[in-house]
């Protein structure tokens, strides 16, 4: 019995979603899996973030349409297919399916868990749309964030005008932190992958640990410090490469 206690907090411009409050949803196209809608437009977000835990016979299909989709393999592995192309993905793997492309996840290993980010594609005039992407974070070199070698950022998707979505992996050594409180137009959806720390969101300070998810609306002041005896890392989404009036 929890006696009504939870670390989850849903505010107007930010949210911390702790795993103790997850309630699965039945979603079209997803079978043999437990799916949780972590972030969605129902809370005011412009991005949807799903957490899907597959059984061995699980399957997920995201139909072609106006939504673009990025999937990150947190545990296990599966086969990802975009139209006629497919690749096996293991832990740390990711796949990006542009709007207009069908994405399928099949043949998951036991214990496979994925995070999914989806948003409506914001087309840019005279700029071609993005191409599909398959990869693994192991093959992406982490760069010191603003010169700090203890805070390393991996940019998983191409940072070109074709893409209006970024998905990045941020890893901090114990004691490393963001160098200032960020306040910007980009929206974030985030999930802690390992370790622990403290996240400042607006005027609230939250202890966070692996499995916690965070939504940050545009201009939500935000700051993070890694604490504990091991590294802390999180995966996050942000919208990029579009003007404020588009």
Per-region residue spans from a language model:
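A short, N-terminal "cap"/entry segment at the start of jelly-roll beta-barrel domains
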Residues: 1-45, 109-164
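Conserved short histidine dyad/triad with adjacent acidic residue
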Residues: 18-19, 31-38, 48-65, 155, ...
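Surface-exposed interaction/gating patches
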Residues: 37, 134-206
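Glycine- and acidic-residue-biased ligand/ion/polar-headgroup-sensing regions
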Residues: 56, 65-83, 185-202
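Ligand-binding loop in jelly-roll beta-barrel domains
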Residues: 66, 86, 99-124, 218-244
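Long compositionally biased, domain-poor regions of proteins
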Residues: 79-81, 105-106, 173-175, 194-201, ...
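Short acidic-glycine-tyrosine-enriched beta hairpin
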Residues: 84-99, 203-218
């Amino acid at each position: 019995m929890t006696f009504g206690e939870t670390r989850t907090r849903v505010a107007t411009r930010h949210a911390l979603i702790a795993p103790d409050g997850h309630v699965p949803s039945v979603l079209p196209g997803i079978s043999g899996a437990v799916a949780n809608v972590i972030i969605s437009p129902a809370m005011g977000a412009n991005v949807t973030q799903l957490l899907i835990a597959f059984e061995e016979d699980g399957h997920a299909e995201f139909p072609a349409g106006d939504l673009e989709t990025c999937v990150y393999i947190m545990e296990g592995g599966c086969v990802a297919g975009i139209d006629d192309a497919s690749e096996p993905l293991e832990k740390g793997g990711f796949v990006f399916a542009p709007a207009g492309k069908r994405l399928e996840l099949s043949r998951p290993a036991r214990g496979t868990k994925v995070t999914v980010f989806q948003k409506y594609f914001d087309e840019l005039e005279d700029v071609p749309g993005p191409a599909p992407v398959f990869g693994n974070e192991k093959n992406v070199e982490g760069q010191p964030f603003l010169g700090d070698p203890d805070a390393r950022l991996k940019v998983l998707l191409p940072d070109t005008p074709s893409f209006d979505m970024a998905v990045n992996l941020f890893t901090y050594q114990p004691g490393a932190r963001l160098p200032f409180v960020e306040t910007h137009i980009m929206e974030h959806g985030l999930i802690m992958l390992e370790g622990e720390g403290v996240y400042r969101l607006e005027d609230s300070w939250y202890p966070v640990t692996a499995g916690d998810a965070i939504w940050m609306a545009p201009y939500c002041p935000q700051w993070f410090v890694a604490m504990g005896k091991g590294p802390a890392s999180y995966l996050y989404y942000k919208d990029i490469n579009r003007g404020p009036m588009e």
